[in-house]
């Protein structure tokens, strides 16, 4: 089931219809959420929004679209987050891999969603631009290579003006790393 508070674009309605996925637009019917086993939340929806608070009160798991897509990919993931430079870094990595003949996709906060990319393609590598909002609701997500470009006070309205909460969201990119994964960061940034 898919719900959109606004109007769903025609091209996405066609995808939903073609895959026999029920949907609603222009609002949310709470009972439909309350019957869900899990909710995949758009990163633009705050964890403090009324609907999310109500869903959480029913102990229904809420995950991000990034977490959802992660369950269905075998691609080697390179995740990039930070306050500035994400798009440039992702574009450069994508260009380098593509120029070297690798099968590589680009998704997340740049281009298509990770879910759409995963459903439509089978790339060897996927470069993901990841905002703090996209990382807020990850559970098992684990890129093989994680990059944090830098950290500056940004989007603090989403984090109750708490910079450390914002930093914690960014560091979720490595929360499931093991000794076989890689973490690249800006050593000159004293916030990392």
Each PLM stretch: what is its role?
Residues 1-14:
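NAD(P)-binding Rossmann-fold cofactor-contacting core
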Residues 11-21, 120-121:
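Short, conserved SAM-binding/catalytic segment
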Residues 30-36, 43-187, 191:
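Phosphate-binding loop of NTP-binding sites
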């Amino acid at each position: 089931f898919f719900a959109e508070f606004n109007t769903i674009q025609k091209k996405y309605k066609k995808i939903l219809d073609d895959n026999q996925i029920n949907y609603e637009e222009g609002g949310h019917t709470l009972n439909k959420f309350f019957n869900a086993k899990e909710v995949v939340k758009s990163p633009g929806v705050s964890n403090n929004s009324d609907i999310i608070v109500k869903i959480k009160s029913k102990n229904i798991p809420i995950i991000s679209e990034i977490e959802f897509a992660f369950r269905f990919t075998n691609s080697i993931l390179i995740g990039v987050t930070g306050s500035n430079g994400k798009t440039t870094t992702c574009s450069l990595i994508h260009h380098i891999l593509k120029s070297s003949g690798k099968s590589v996709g680009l998704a997340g906060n740049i281009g298509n969603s990770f879910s759409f990319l995963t459903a439509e393609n089978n790339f060897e590598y996927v470069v993901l631009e990841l905002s703090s909002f996209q990382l807020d609701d990850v559970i098992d997500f684990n890129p093989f290579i994680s990059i944090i470009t830098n950290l500056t006070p940004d989007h603090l309205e989403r984090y109750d003006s708490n910079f450390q909460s914002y930093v914690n969201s960014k560091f979720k990119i490595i929360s499931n790393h093991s000794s076989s994964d890689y973490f690249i960061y800006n050593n000159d940034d004293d916030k990392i």
